[in-house]
């Protein structure tokens, strides 16, 4: 199936944009493009022949990859790419970056093993300087991905699609790129704004301990210098004058960091930040609310699964990423709940600069918990089950739980400085849920500056900052909580098949189906008018309607899967969103 962006995808260099806007250097080289590939048996020996060409970074299962073939749990997917360093990278140390590879991969340069990584959703890096030779080099990657036959974090990926379970994403699905650095460089830069004390905190992780290191920071607003300071690796920078960041005013400031050893500058990077504060608090009526910049702020959101009919988990172009964010904002929404997926860093950058709040889910794992726990009990109003009986929600093995913690920490550290991320969501509807209270404490220990929805939807353990309700069948009712803000974190899901713009019309799935745009719009308006708007003054602090677009057989998007047709009248969407406020 083609999207409205399919024809804009380059066969030689798809997604050519700089992949990490939060930490920008001049010396880099994009390795996206056509690779040789081979799907082999379980042997990890380098194959002698190839099956054909694959367009990276699109997974083999999707249309844009030019393969359109899945990877079995017993197979290995091999990639081969010959490359030479661009002139501006020569004479430096070379880092090889992968935005994401699903799930386990081993990386080789010129047939020499470089390193491995486990986890399908986060970025990782290898220093390949000592493996390179003059002239042409070869990158080889071997991937193993068990999808739903394994226990790993994988979201809704399955080997056999049905309902709201989707086509797997195997192998490389985000940008592959090279970066040139010196012997001492900034490995990681964290920035935390503090509007209560008019400052930012910075944390700079250097690759090496060296004598005579000096670090200079400069904060810019366009051409104007707001602050300059020689800083330590852990330091604060005061700001005298600034604007708050918000969806209505997504003001960002540039941050330039230069590292010198003696008189020589060894690293220079550009970053950015927004001055904002996320919290919960009491309004004038004493109701616990979501707060933005110390003021109550109603969040009107959409569930955003980040799937594309032509690219799977990979947006076909940067423009496509921007479309979903800017179009939802144009329709009056101010929040996206990024549902059990971690996006490329450019997606978060676009949310930062366009002004879109993000609730970030952790990717779910474990085996399916079964229809009784996943559907029957919650839909008759039973939410009070403890999650420390690990087999109940498919986390019986210690290694499953340990791996979850490892990947959760990896995600939070990667996204820590994203301006727009408002809330962490460790668990969704009990899929692989365990020890949610302890996990909430763990998340808080990593990041105390954001709100936490510790168990979105079903089996609430009474922790976190959000009293989180999912309602698709029974009527929505208000739950009052003194300590937590009440948010309907999933609802609606009203469905409509648009002929010629649907993945599979015969297998189309939805909770409540409507025959036309008019009937769908009327039902949407009635749902919001009758069940949402009346309870805002009484305690509702935010909503998440399901969802941004159709996804495969699931036809409950406000847009079709190809992003060609808006299925609900835009004037109604805008009018209702204008009423969703305190």
Label the model's feature ranges:
Residues 326, 335-576:
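Substrate-binding/catalytic cleft of secreted carbohydrate-active enzymes
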Residues 108-114, 220-222, 262, 293-294:
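Short strand-turn-strand beta-turns centered on an Asx-Gly dipeptide
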Residues 21, 36-42, 69-185, 209, ...:
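Accessory beta-strand-rich segments of carbohydrate-active enzymes
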Residues 1-28:
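N-terminal pre-domain segments of enzymes
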Residues 180-210, 284-289, 580-582:
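Surface beta-strand/loop "capping" patches
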Residues 189-193, 256-328, 579:
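N-terminal carbohydrate-binding accessory modules
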Residues 130-136, 205-283:
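Extended acidic/polar, glycine-enriched regions
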Residues 71-77, 90-92, 124, 251, ...:
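Aromatic- and glycine-enriched glycan-recognition loops and surfaces
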